């Protein structure tokens, strides 16, 4: 909708009324830096400007869908194509292109614009053979791509530093280009803003993306894809025969980038994983030289922990048997009895070095807990 926020009880998660000015007060403040003196007066300042025109974001949706079925329902499915344009998206004051000398936090404003498009495909197959076996297959695929059209970026920023023109949650990273092989490479490399004196042969050669001779936050560039997959796939296949049934479900994603390293629950890295392929002067390894607690710049890891987050997971398999109506079930007062054996998260095909479920977040700190593999043996009884 596009209803203006006019009710005083409508608040946002930071607990502030975005359409009201925020006042701060204090006293006994030192005035000036020469012969300072306290003032006995209480002062008031506007710490955040309100915006009385705050409203809900709006969306314009365009969809085209087709449902189909053939051969008496043996082949069925659907095709959906969509195109959305969202406008008036709320932009935080800290994300706005406001000069530092403005004097206070900029107000929230409905400035953002995002477009997205894609399609959804579904195919269902169902057939019963002459010998009584019923087999079925359900598959689906979703392709969704979004792009930030406007985000109130500073107009003089290079395009690669802007949010506009890129996907939501686009990965930004320092880019590494091989290793610093010799001391000459170290001396001739761009300056790190932190820990430059700690650079050694074997460290990553970080690309000075903007060419100013310094490695800083302005050298973080778009890398690979967003942390949200562009494509998702789902397939379920099963069969039934004389009370027996078997079922398997696969799930996969691609065109996604994820961060994976190996912290323990106390945020300490596992050395065997982190340094198992460390750099040596012959240049045979792909990782940097190991260190003994030396503080180095945050840029030093480059793209080391960013991986192609594509995977195909065997998410669930189940084998079951449902007892047919029999006298012994009736004698026990049981209408239906089914026994089953199933397993979850049985296998995953991926280029990532570890099994991290995507819904735990894209970063390693969110996904440090491993995906659990489970097996269940049970019985369902209906009285």
Predicted regions and their residues:
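Transmembrane beta-barrel strands of outer-membrane/channel proteins
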Residues: 1-3, 7-11, 15-23, 77-83, ...
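Solvent-exposed loop/turn elements at secondary-structure boundaries
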Residues: 1-57, 76, 80-114
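Transmembrane beta-strands of outer-membrane beta-barrel pores
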Residues: 2, 81-87, 125-127, 141-147, ...
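Conserved small-residue
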Residues: 4-17, 21-23, 109, 126-227, ...
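Residues on the lipid-exposed face of transmembrane beta-strands in outer-membrane beta-barrel proteins
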Residues: 64-68, 79, 121-125, 235-241, ...
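Repeated loop/turn-to-beta-strand initiation elements of outer-membrane beta-barrel proteins
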Residues: 73-77, 119, 130-131, 243-247, ...
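C-terminal beta-signal and terminal closure region of outer-membrane beta-barrel proteins
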Residues: 100, 104, 108-116, 159-186, ...
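Extracytoplasmic gating/loop element in the C-terminal half of outer-membrane beta-barrel translocons
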Residues: 198-199, 253-343
